């Protein structure tokens, strides 16, 4: 992998890339892990980068709850993005990839609903997306990469041979999140979760830069009525028909 890759939308990749885009709660993370395990490829959780940036911005005393963000705050967040000291390390005990900011394990701190809302806000800043673009492309390494995000197939790896768009109804995603939190002993209102998901969808789909839309030629899967194993089977079947050599 060359470090000096072009940051244009006509990026020519040397290795194999599968992109999996879609809204929060559709099951992208689980699907990405399953596909990567099947192929023995690397994983990029691009959403984690934006969640980490949201945490870093709040640590720098930038109030992300005030909307719209001021130009000064946007500039400050962009500077943080350009100097973000992030690593992803494999936990040999759990098998999970854990995020580190400035050598400190963020653990589950970036997986809260608040972190997701913060990520959506910083991701709407065009200069932030530019700052993180090259960093995301640097994850592309042999033997291949499965990239999970919202603009992986439209912007970051727009020439990927396989593009997946995984979606589900807002109601279904709210129910899934509600059940996850209840199982963890966290009391929450499903109505509040649904409102939060709809607000994030609105922000992600209508931002001026890299809005959340299926990439041209993407294989669209609605997981609302499907189990994750059914989604996985559909995706592997699609890959096998379109690019069978990737499964060899």
Where are these regions (language model features)?
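Extreme N-terminal, non-catalytic leader segments
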Residues: 1-17
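Hydrophobic anchor at the beta1->P-loop junction of P-loop NTPases
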Residues: 20
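The conserved Walker
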Residues: 24
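Conserved lysine of the Walker
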Residues: 28
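Hydrophobic positions on the alpha1 helix immediately C-terminal to the Walker A/P-loop
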Residues: 31
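N-terminal phosphate/diphosphate-binding loop that engages ATP/GTP or pyrophosphate donors
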Residues: 38-110
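ATP-dependent NMP and nucleoside kinases share a basic, alpha-helical "lid"
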Residues: 106-184
